From Swiss-Prot:
It comes from Oscheius tipulae. Keywords: Cleavage on pair of basic residues, Disulfide bond, Glycoprotein, Repeat, Secreted, Signal, Storage protein. Glycans are attached at N237, N371, N683, N1295, N1584, N1617. PANTHER family: VITELLOGENIN 1-RELATED, VITELLOGENIN-RELATED. GO terms for cellular component: extracellular region. Residues 26-691 form the Vitellogenin domain. The record marks K741, R742 as: Cleavage. This is Vitellogenin-6. Residues 1-15 form the signal peptide.
Length: 1648
């Protein structure tokens, strides 16, 4: 609409002229005059709102010459501006007078080649200025029209009619060399209308300059394809023919939209409308002067000379480039003014402080060395805060001049090393890097002052690498010199020189830290030539592993520019099974960052089938799985490729201590963020080798792969952990009696361990000697920002002195911590700054800037005290913090249009200021119980805490082109006032916490439109104020105390005794006689029996947590209190939890709000075998009652009973085949996971609570994850019953049935699984006696211990390799600590040659324990003496059940039933274990290591090496040499295969039990698939109605047990063969027209 009004005004103005147009085509010797009007505006994309506009008007004289040349002159040029919301005529705008010099430059003639409408070379006078030549190019650009279809690249796809024509061609225009689309319409025989459109998405060259995008990567998939951010369209009226023609009028419409945040929000728009109208053609009355000294020749492309001059000055500091910049202002005085203003602003940080600091940065970017030298004395007189902000401004400016000046200040020690280190971080993001700046940094990094400070040295070299990336790396920055110069800023010789210097530094480095530092500097540089040197480091096995892993990571900045090269380097490393898992996983991680092709992915997938390393296999699978589920639009293509490759991989179950990779996505439309989490484990450490968390974002079509990342890397920290734990244990043994007895003087277990090593010639299992190291690193914008190495070389001397003789020296701690520290910290930064310079169709530059200047200051004091003072030990500490932080930040989105009369534009300001005083004290005491007390004092005066605002501003500044200016031209600013009828103002004011005496007022106003989603707040203000002093709040006190493990008598259960009260039928369900036995007594009787048994044990422990918060002062004391009391028996089978809470009444309440609740739960007796689990019901019962409210009370009682579902009991019956009570424990453990929970709730609640409950209930019914089925049903009032059934194997599927008073609701997951295993109650877990925190930690640690199971002739190793070997009458070493100082050994032998009874011996540092079954009784000897049962517990021996005995030797535990045993060992013995239980390192390929630490494939040879022969035993050589006794049964197994096997059995049994209906099945590519629904069987004697249905299949991967899978087909009634159908998750298949009959096991109907 605005364009239409503008064109109408132009038409009226031109119609009023007495034009004389008598020509039909251009002829030499004639003159043609055009009226030129150009309108340039910037504003919000809201029609009818105010804009900042500039108008240029001129009379254009054109005189054709012979030989296809024309002369052009601009005359009567005028300028005008406006800030109105509509387009005005020139006379109604504010005309701006121009100087004679400007008018003279604009009137200089030009000469250009012009043939068939195409513009060639343009000649300018020597006096011509760059800005004026670009304006004249804009006029000439409107005359260019391709009449003869020169360079046509594509013909019209449609039929060409006689009056219509369309074609494409590549054309050089003012705005770039781009594809141009033409359309011609014939109006008459000699009159045509031409339309010309520039396609900016297909440009080979654009004079566009971009800064601040060095770290972003293009995300083509993130952009909306139908959105045009730049468009320019021409409309021509032409008479004549292509050879002889005349342009009567030209209209140009151009638009540029800028989206600084997201492409869905176009916040700022620039519009250009130009028009050329022929007003005269006829005789030349005055010839245009010839172009003087016409050696200055250019093409039609925009000339970025001014922008290049700015770049060159920033890069080199040469002042000659400043003289080429129009409107240059001497910066000396301006910097003085800004510093003085900044001094006033630092007294109270406000939003204006950001603007002052941003202007200071802008001025410094044009400052010369003389300017900075002239203000030395002024800076020295300023406060430390102002000086700190000034140093930051110099670093942010980032020019050669400011960088040199800053480094000089650091060398002169005017800036502290810590502050200098922070400045180096800012220099890493220098806006326009150059070779000169890099050289300055390199010299500084080599200086003495840097070498003396480790922190400064690290920052300097990392920043040097980042600057090199800007100079020689491949970034998205576009510099002006790249548009006009063919020579690149960085040559190959320069790249090789930089990398060679860093490699030499790395090779010369003596410490591991120094080597890692220079590798990280190379990583930051991201130069392509570094790949060769990094490959040498990666492939060199002699290089330390830490350095090699860092070298792999150093390839990350080249992942998209050199993907194939990186894959060629790292794929051999990944596929080399001799490499350590840590190296291989790092290689895989980097390969996946290159977004590999399907061929590379297939290689990785095929390698998984033969992969022996558990860590590598699991990490590879989790990485591929994560990528296949990625929501990041930047990974759309790689997600598709990975999904295809992943289809052939069986699901890999991930254990807790295994490598894995996870992502969490937050995406809306094409923008969002991804949080990545990865853990890498290795076979030489129980601790993770590396833990990383990274954040990547997609905004505005740009992908920031590593916006922020934090990681922890360690190597060989296990040795430190082992020593620490051993030290703690030894210290405790000196103070406490160790299990009652110690070794006698004649019986020395330690000597027995050593003699065992000597007799079997056991070699020490020891990882290669390597000093421990830990390293925490931070990355920002894909650059290594900082890293902290922790090893013996880098620890400060002060920390080394803290530990003396294994004890902490309190005097050293007090000396460091108790000194009160007063501090004043100030800093500033541009957290985000991007600049985009684009030429407009008027030949004037338009600059889009997005930045976020931030200024912060904090004054405060910190004091730390140890209590009590002057004591040998301390029992408490006190921390006092008093500070007042001030932070102000503004996000500025600005579009500025530069013209010969100044600059106009629009900016959006989003600012915030926070001033939050902190005055708090924390006291901690642990003498008798843990007590934490925190006191927070309130402000004594009224304070403004926070202020946020957002507003659009129009601005303009007037400058003169004809002279150098000495003062900064302050812009005139005007806030855009949005129309009230379209954007009404909404004001608000809220008050909070008035009752506490600390009234907080939140007030503000915002504008919200009626019809669109556009929201723009003008000002939103938040403030906090206190009441008058006599009533004001003084402080808030929070208190917490904890006491635990206080021994007491077992109390009578109070709730569970009432579990079946008045509800005798509760939870009684119909039994399935096929696999559930009839109970001899009801559930209620069973529960009472369990309660009596628990109570009879007598001993229990109570725990208490008390929390309270209250106010001091104010009109009334406000408080809230919570007390949690717990009581558990020592085996944690029964627990009671009481929670009491209260708070003071709040607004609308007159009474105190209170909560009183109690919960009890009871575990059944732990079943030792599957048989015992099947003998009777094993239920977990819990009950909770709660009562809460103020005036009105709510009361709820919930009963929960957990049990096995019918399906799980069926599986238990099938699995109950193992005769040994011990070896069926694994199956019993899985079966002990209760998968069905019956919940019964009764309630009496207030209407408000009932309304909330109904909302939650409705949300679940409509949640998109669920498929809901609702059946109206009348049930009892105030009662809800619910049944939750988990799929028992993977626990990633569940069904929920809810019975409310009015309906029955069935919820099922809709064709998907939960991303994690759902928690379930395990009635098989047994912690032993839990009497202290130490016991809790110990019990949890044992849950993750590896286990070795030893049967009569079969052994399952710690790494889950199954093999067969005979057991002799001589002792064999099963498990042993084979380190230099062994802690334990576990041995076993047969008691007799023909019997199966075994004798076990467990040797620890303290005792030798022997167990042997004699006459159905267990004989126990300790240190050679038989001991009675009442003393077993003193030595860690206990009996569990009737047949199992348990030995706890701290580092190792053994369960033994007289025949078979299970050994569990601490994970700290990774790579230190030896014996028949294998070489424990997490891998399955090297289990058979003989006693001399040599690997062998001969199991007999392996077994003999651990056979301890003596005079008391004899080896049966015939049995020993029988080869049939030795065999690897399964080298690897996985729970997924076990699950598949179990499912096969279940499906098989289900098929046999159904005769009325059948399932559909098909087989393909190592998979057997069954339909998830059962269907009525078609009877041949009847006519069947059929319809097409979608059949969902569950596919099981075939393993080595394929015959078992195949047998399902023969057992099941599968009459339909679907082998002719491709592998699709959902198939269309005819089925009988009848209702669905549920499967015999519906909870096992897994979704595909």
């Amino acid at each position: 609409m605005r364009f239409a009004v503008l064109l109408a005004l132009f038409g009226l103005a031109l119609a009023a002229r007495q034009s004389s147009v008598s020509e039909q085509y251009y002829r030499s010797g004639r003159e043609y005059r055009y009226q030129f009007n150009g309108h340039l505006s910037a504003g919000l994309p809201i029609p009818g709102e105010e804009n900042s506009a500039t108008r240029i008007q001129s009379l254009i004289r054109i005189q054709p010459e012979n030989g296809d040349f024309m002369r052009l002159q601009m005359t009567k040029t005028r300028f005008a501006t406006s800030e109105e919301d509509r387009v005005l005529s020139f006379e109604n705008m504010n005309e701006v007078p121009v100087s004679e010099k400007v008018e003279k430059v604009l009137s200089l003639p030009i000469r250009f080649s012009y043939r068939h409408g195409m513009v060639g070379e343009i000649e300018f006078s020597t006096e011509e200025q760059t800005w004026s030549s670009n304006i004249k190019k804009a006029v000439v650009n409107m005359l260019q029209v391709n009449l003869v279809k020169k360079g046509m690249s594509e013909k019209n796809e449609y039929e060409t009619e006689h009056d219509n024509d369309f074609f494409l061609s590549n054309e050089r225009t003012l705005e770039g060399e781009c594809e141009v689309a033409y359309t011609k319409i014939e109006k008459s025989e000699k009159e045509q209308q031409w339309t010309k459109s520039i396609n900016f998405e297909k440009c080979s060259l654009r004079p566009e300059i971009v800064y601040g995008r060095r770290y972003a990567e293009e995300c083509n998939e993130c952009r909306e394809r139908d959105e045009k951010f730049s468009s320019t369209v021409f409309f021509y009226n032409i008479t004549g023919t292509p050879e002889e023609f005349l342009i009567n009028s030209v209209e140009l419409q151009s638009k540029h939209m800028f989206a600084p945040v997201t492409e869905q929000k176009q916040l700022i728009t620039a519009r250009i409308t130009n028009r050329l109208e022929l007003v005269y053609s006829g005789e030349q009355k005055e010839q245009i002067e010839a172009v003087r000294n016409s050696d200055k020749k250019e093409n039609l492309l925009y000339n970025p000379e001014h922008e290049i001059a700015e770049e060159k000055f920033a890069q080199t500091g040469d002042e000659k480039y400043l003289r080429r910049i129009p409107n240059y202002v001497d910066q000396g005085e301006i910097i003085r003014q800004q510093l003085n203003r900044l001094s006033k602003q630092t007294e109270q940080i406000e939003l204006e402080s950001n603007h002052v600091h941003a202007r200071l940065v802008k001025s410094l970017r044009f400052a010369t060395e003389d300017n900075l030298s002239s203000i030395r004395s002024l800076v020295s007189q300023k406060s430390e805060v102002v000086q700190s902000l000034y140093w930051d401004a110099l670093a942010i400016a980032g020019t050669k001049v400011t960088v040199s000046h800053l480094l000089e200040k650091i060398n002169n020690k005017e800036i502290s090393p810590m502050k200098a280190s922070q400045l180096m971080k800012i220099l890493a993001e220098v806006r326009i890097p150059s070779e000169q700046i890099a050289q300055e940094l390199h010299r500084f990094c080599e200086s003495d002052i840097v070498s003396r400070s480790a922190v400064l040295r690290q920052s300097c070299w990392l920043s040097y690498g980042s600057v090199l990336n800007g100079v020689c790396g491949q970034t998205k920055n576009v510099y002006g010199s790249e548009i006009t110069e063919t020579r690149k800023q960085c040559t190959r010789q320069m790249k090789e020189k930089y990398i060679r210097e860093l490699i030499e530094k790395m090779n010369q480095a003596e410490s591991r830290y120094e080597k890692v530092l220079f590798v990280k500097a190379i990583a930051n540089a991201g130069i392509d030539t570094s790949v060769v040197e990094l490959e040498k480091i990666i492939r060199n096995q002699e290089v330390e592993k830490t350095v090699r892993m860092q070298a792999i990571d150093a390839l990350r900045r080249l992942r998209l520019s050199m993907p194939k090269k990186i894959q060629n380097v790292l794929m051999p490393v990944y596929r080399n099974h001799k490499e350590t898992p840590g190296i291989r996983i790092s290689a895989l991680h980097m390969i996946m960052q290159t977004q590999p092709t399907s061929g590379v992915l297939d290689m990785i997938v095929r390698g998984l089938e033969k992969e022996r390393s558990q860590q590598v296999r699991v990490y590879t699978w989790s990485t591929l799985k994560t990528l296949s589920e990625s929501e990041n639009p930047a990974e759309k293509e790689i997600r598709r490729r990975v999904s295809q490759s992943l289809a052939s991989i069986p699901v890999e179950e991930q254990k807790y201590l295994e490598s894995k990779h996870k992502t969490f996505n937050w995406f809306n439309m094409q923008s969002g963020a991804t949080l990545n989490w990865a853990t890498i484990f290795s076979n030489d450490s129980v601790l993770p080798k590396e833990i990383t968390a990274s954040l990547e974002t997609v905004f505005g079509g740009e992908w920031n792969k590593y916006l922020a990342q934090i990681g922890l890397y360690q190597n060989n920290l296990d040795s430190v952990l082992s020593k620490l734990l051993q030290k703690v244990e030894e210290t405790g043994l000196e103070q406490l009696v160790v299990r009652g007895k110690r070794s006698s003087s004649f019986f020395r277990p330690a000597e027995m361990l050593r003699s065992l090593v000597e007799s079997l010639r056991i070699s020490h299992r020891q990882v290669p000697a390597m000093s421990p190291i830990a390293m925490i690193y931070l990355r920002y914008k894909d650059q290594d920002y900082a890293f902290l190495p922790i090893d013996i070389d880098t620890l400060p001397e002060m920390i080394r002195r803290v530990a003396r003789d294994g004890q902490l020296d309190l005097s050293e701690i007090e000396k460091v911590l108790t000194q009160a520290a007063r501090f004043t910290v100030a800093g500033s930064a541009f957290f985000h700054e991007t600049v985009r310079k684009v030429p407009s169709a008027l030949g004037m530059p338009q600059v889009m800037t997005s930045k976020m200047p931030t200024v912060a200051q904090m004054n405060g004091e910190v004091k730390f005290d140890l209590e009590p003072l002057n004591s040998d030990k301390f029992t408490g500490l006190r921390l006092r913090v008093k500070a007042e932080p001030h932070v102000a930040s503004t996000h500025v989105c600005k579009l500025e249009l530069f013209t010969p009369i100044g600059g106009q534009g629009i900016k959006l300001l989003h600012g915030g200021r926070i001033q939050a005083p902190i005055d708090s004290e924390i006291e901690i005491n642990w003498e008798k119980k843990l007590i934490v007390k925190a006191t927070i004092k309130s402000p004594e005066q009224k304070r403004h805490i926070a202020h946020f605002m957002t507003r659009p501003v129009l601005f303009s500044r007037e400058v003169t082109m004809d002279k150098q200016m000495r003062q900064y031209p302050e812009p005139r600013e005007k806030t855009i006032q949005l129309r009230e009828n379209r954007f009404p103002i909404h004001a608000f004011e809220r008050q909070y916490f008035e009752q506490t005496g600390l009234k907080m007022t939140v007030s503000g106003h915002y504008r919200r439109p009626f019809t669109t989603a556009f929201t723009l707040g003008e000002s939103i203000m938040m403030s906090s104020s206190s009441l008058p002093r006599m009533l004001s709040l003084k402080e808030v006190v929070a208190y917490m105390s904890f006491s635990g493990f206080e021994e007491t008598e077992m109390d009578e259960p109070r709730l569970l005794n009432r579990f079946y009260e008045k509800e005798t039928e509760l939870f009684e369900t119909e039994k399935n006689v096929e696999y559930e036995q009839e109970d001899k007594e009801p559930k209620s009787s069973q529960l009472q029996s369990q309660i009596r048994k628990v109570k009879s044990e007598g001993k229990a422990y109570k725990h208490r947590v008390h929390m309270k918060i209250h106010t001091v002062g104010g009109p009334k004391t406000q408080e809230a209190e919570c007390e949690i009391r717990a009581l558990c028996d020592e085996r944690v089978r029964f627990c009671r939890l009481n929670l009491d809470a209260s708070r003071s009444p709040i607004q609308g309440e007159s009474r105190q709000w209170q909560l009183k609740s109690s919960a009890e739960w009871l575990y059944p007796e732990v079943p030792s075998t599957m048989k015992k689990m099947l003998e009777s019901r094993r239920e977990w019962n819990a009950m909770w009652t709660g009562k809460w409210g103020s005036e009105k009370q709510n009361e709820v009682t919930i009963r929960v009973q957990g049990e096995q579902s019918s399906e799980q009991k069926f599986w238990m019956k099938k699995a109950e085949r193992e005769q040994s009570p011990l070896t069926s424990g694994g199956q019993a453990s899985r079966a002990a996971q209760l998968n069905q929970y019956n919940i019964h709730a009764t309630y009496e609640v207030t209407p408000e609570t009932e309304f909330w409950m109904e909302n939650v209930y409705s949300m679940f019914k409509t949640y998109y994850f669920f498929s809901a089925e609702v059946q109206p049903k009348q049930n009892k009032e105030n009662r809800i019953q619910c049944q939750i059934t988990l799929e028992p194997f993977t626990r990633q599927l569940f069904n929920v049935t809810v019975m409310s008073p009015k309906e029955k609701l069935v919820l099922e997951l809709e064709n998907q699984q939960t991303p994690f295993r759902l928690p379930a109650v395990n009635i098989g877990r047994e912690f032993g006696r839990v009497q202290s925190v130490r016991h809790v930690v110990k019990a949890v640690e044992r849950q993750t211990r590896p286990e070795c199971i030893v049967k009569s002739k079969e052994i399952q190793t710690f790494d889950e390799v199954f093999y067969r070997t005979p057991v002799m009458e001589c002792f064999s070493v099963l498990a042993k600590d084979c380190s230099e100082n062994p802690d334990f050994a576990v041995l076993m032998r047969k008691v007799s040659k023909r019997g199966e009874e075994k004798m076990w011996k467990v040797i620890s540092r303290e005792n030798v324990i022997e167990l042997e079954k004699k006459s159905e009784e267990m004989s126990v000897r300790v240190n050679g003496k038989e001991i009675s049962e009442d003393k077993w517990e003193d030595f860690g021996i206990s009996q569990r059940g009737e047949e199992k005995f348990f030995i706890d030797a701290e580092k190792v535990t053994v369960e033994f039933d007289g025949f078979q045993a299970k050994i569990q060992m601490s994970s700290l013995y990774k790579n230190k274990q030896c014996g028949l239980c294998g070489h424990y390192d997490g891998e399955k390929t090297n289990e058979f290591r003989r006693a001399d630490n040599e690997e062998t494939d001969d199991i007999e040879e392996f077994s003999r090496s651990y056979l301890s022969k003596d005079d008391e035993c004899e080896v049966d050589e015939q049995e020993m040499t029988n080869k049939r006794n030795y065999k690897v049964l399964r080298e690897e197994t996985s729970s997924s295969e076990e699950i598949s096997e179990s499912l096969i059995e279940l499906y098989s049994e289900a098929f046999q039990s159904r005769e009325a209906h059948h399932r559909l099945g098909r087989r393909e590519d190592r998979q057997v698939c069954f339909s998830q629904q059962a269907w009525n069987k078609c009877l041949k004697s009847k006519d069947n109605k059929t319809e097409t249905k979608n059949v969902h299949f569950k596919c099981l991967t075939e393993t080595t047990r394929s015959p078992r899978i195949s047998s399902v087909f023969s057992q099941a009634d599968i009459s339909e063969n679907l082998s002719d159908v491709e592998g699709l998750p959902s198939l269309a298949e005819p089925s009988p027209h009848s209702r669905f009959l549920p499967c015999v096991i519906p909870s096992l109907s897994l979704s595909q």
